[in-house]
Amino acid sequence: MASYSTNDFKPGLKFIQDGEPCVIVENEFVKPGKGQAFTRTKIRKLISGKVLEINFKSGSTVEAADVVDYNYTYSYKDEDFWYFMHPETFEQISVDSKALGDNDKWLVDQAECIITLWNGSAIGVTPPNFVELEVIETDPGLKGDTAGTGGKPATLSTGAVVRVPLFVQIGEVIRVDTRSGEYVSRVK
């Protein structure tokens, strides 16, 4: 298996730490005035989602993780699994709720998602950055009701709840940023 030296560390590098695939979020080479140089890294474990800060001695090595990201198209959901299809090979893959996390609220038919595979099994799903969803429930916006200007909560067709401006009505389609869960615009 391939390995990486601390000299190869950069954000986005994936490796194995404590038997779990991790990705480097930040790294910094530190050369103290006294003592051995080291690399301070902030890593995120891909399965558990924990963020840790670990120091590696200068020149030490870590094992490379066999982690690959693929583009898949969301197909459908049954009771326990969500199914995605590869757009070129038409191969289907099933993903459980542990790998999907809370991203199920952003999945719409034919959505292009990025699935992270480790040793052939799905460990994470990244939905598209923006999705267009219909508002199925929200309070009516009253004319002149602008005190607070914080907007109002709206329930979308997938069950997600986002804050929207007062002018958004039931039945309208809105664009939502899935990374932050915030309203972006109305769709014409």
UniProtKB/Swiss-Prot annotation:
Gene3D superfamilies: 2.30.30.30, Nucleic acid-binding proteins. GO terms for molecular function: translation elongation factor activity. The modification N6-(3,6-diaminohexanoyl)-5-hydroxylysine is found at K34. May be beta-lysylated on the epsilon-amino group of Lys-34 by the combined action of EpmA and EpmB, and then hydroxylated on the C5 position of the same residue by EpmC (if this protein is present). Lysylation is critical for the stimulatory effect of EF-P on peptide-bond formation. The lysylation moiety may extend toward the peptidyltransferase center and stabilize the terminal 3-CCA end of the tRNA. Hydroxylation of the C5 position on Lys-34 may allow additional potential stabilizing hydrogen-bond interactions with the P-tRNA. The keyword Plastid does not apply. It is found in: Cytoplasm. It comes from the Bacteria. SMART domains: EFP (SM01185), Elong-fact-P_C (SM00841). InterPro entries: Elong-fact-P_C, NA-bd_OB-fold, Rib_uL2_dom2, Transl_elong_fac_P/YeiP, Transl_elong_KOW-like, Transl_elong_P/YeiP_cen, Transl_elong_P/YeiP_CS, Transl_elongation_fac_P. Keywords: Cytoplasm, Elongation factor, Hydroxylation, Protein biosynthesis. Belongs to the elongation factor P family. Involved in peptide bond synthesis. Alleviates ribosome stalling that occurs when 3 or more consecutive Pro residues or the sequence PPG is present in a protein, possibly by augmenting the peptidyl transferase activity of the ribosome. Modification of Lys-34 is required for alleviation. HAMAP family: EF_P. This is Elongation factor P. It comes from Glaesserella parasuis serovar 5 (strain SH0165).
